[in-house]
Amino acid sequence: PIKHSLSPIIHNAALTALNLNWCYLALPCETANLGLVLESLRKINCKGLNITIPHKQEVINYCKAVEPIAKNIGAVNTLIPAKDNYWNGTNTDIQGFLAPLKKCESLAGKDGVVLGSGGSARAVVHGLNSLNLSHITIISRNRNSLEKLLNLIELTKSTSTTYLSLIEGDSSIKEYIRDSSLIVNTTPVGMLNKSKKKESMAIPLGKEYW
């Protein structure tokens, strides 16, 4: 997914505007090489890292310390240099996700759908719980990651007004989307024009899609 990222354009423009002699690069990394890449970047005095899918959960294992907000959702998307060539981890996904939503009408008492159950989904569900939605339905193809997400939410006691389920088949997905006011896609679907699921994931008129 790193190939689709607009982060280099955004951050390099900001660095130029601030007259900082830094650069922001997108670096492909296989999971098997994650530890080696992180160690190498720290040794060359890299000033910080953003972590994207599929590494947001695995990267926790390489952090010297993890901030509470990242611990609560079990995912890290930002690494900050620490002493002795270590990294500290945090998560800014929640703030980034909620910022535009707070400019919209209140979602309190309404239903929402989250597509996916990985690291980004963890942050999204955590953020949605602060908006007092009536129900949140999580739709995932990966039962293992979904069960881990449900266990995490249960441990953080954030399920008092949340309905969570694994839905099989496009027809069921469309039913939940139809009855919800907010749809959040945390999956790779839609990142590439050649996505095979593009047509089947068409969003009904009047729905908010993030």
Predicted regions and their residues:
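Rossmann-like adenosine-cofactor binding region
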Residues: 161-210
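Short acidic/polar active-site loop segments enriched in Thr and Asp
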Residues: 47, 110, 134, 159
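NAD(P)-binding Rossmann-fold cofactor-contacting core
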Residues: 133-156
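Receiver (REC) domain switch-region micro-motif
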Residues: 49, 112, 183-184
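Short glycine-rich anion-binding loops that position phosphate/pyrophosphate groups of nucleotides
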Residues: 51-58, 119, 188-191
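Glycine-rich adenosine-cofactor-binding loop
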Residues: 91, 101, 105-133, 140-143
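Phosphate/diphosphate ligand-binding glycine-rich loop within oxidoreductases
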Residues: 1-104
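Conserved acidic residues
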Residues: 28-30, 142, 166-170
